[in-house]
A protein has these predicted regions:
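Interaction interfaces in information-processing and related assembly proteins
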Residues: 1-95
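Short alpha-helical
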Residues: 36, 108, 120
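Short metal-coordination and nucleic-acid-contact micro-motifs, chiefly zinc-binding Cys/His arrays
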Residues: 94-97, 118-121
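Alpha-helical hinge/cap motifs
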Residues: 95-99, 105, 109
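Short cysteine-rich clusters marking metal-coordination/redox-active sites
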Residues: 101-104, 122-125
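Short functional micro-motifs and their immediate structural scaffolds
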Residues: 108-109, 127-130
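Short Cys/His-rich "knuckle" micro-motifs
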Residues: 111-116
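A short beta-strand motif that forms part of the nucleic acid-binding face
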Residues: 117, 126
Length: 131
């Protein structure tokens, strides 16, 4: 089964082999994910600051306000990490290293990259790292 985008199938030369270095479909996918993640991080940061300001206006921070701030903070940290992962994947693509396992240097199958475009490891090495 091949995954497709508007630019065509997300496959390597053999359908599930290594990714063509600098493949435009991979760049388009990663850039789309980067924009979505940047928008998410921006929205979460704004929501956090608004919630923080509202908590300050209330005179005293009640438990629900503190819990909301903590939830927003955790989501923001997670989203920033995902944004950084996408930026790193774009850097690997530009450097010609995208689609190659950082641990064993094996080609990462296109099917795995289609499922998790930011992955740095083949399935075997990811299992060994507990990912």
């Amino acid at each position: 089964m091949q995954t497709e985008t508007s630019q065509g199938p997300l496959t390597g030369p053999e359908g599930d082999g290594p990714v063509p270095t600098g493949g435009p479909q991979w760049r388009a996918l990663l850039e789309m994910r980067w924009r979505a993640r940047l928008q998410e991080v921006t929205g979460l940061a704004l929501a956090y600051h608004e919630a923080e300001a509202a908590a300050g206006r209330g005179g005293g921070e009640d438990r629900l306000q503190v819990q909301r701030l903590l939830r927003l903070q955790r989501r923001t940290v997670t989203s920033r990490r995902a944004l950084a992962d996408t930026e790193e994947a774009l850097a690997r693509l530009s450097a010609g290293r995208y689609g190659w396992c950082e641990s064993c240097a094996a080609a990462i199958p296109a099917r795995r990259l289609a499922a998790t475009p930011e992955t740095r490891y083949c399935a075997r090495c990811a299992r060994g790292r507990g990912r």
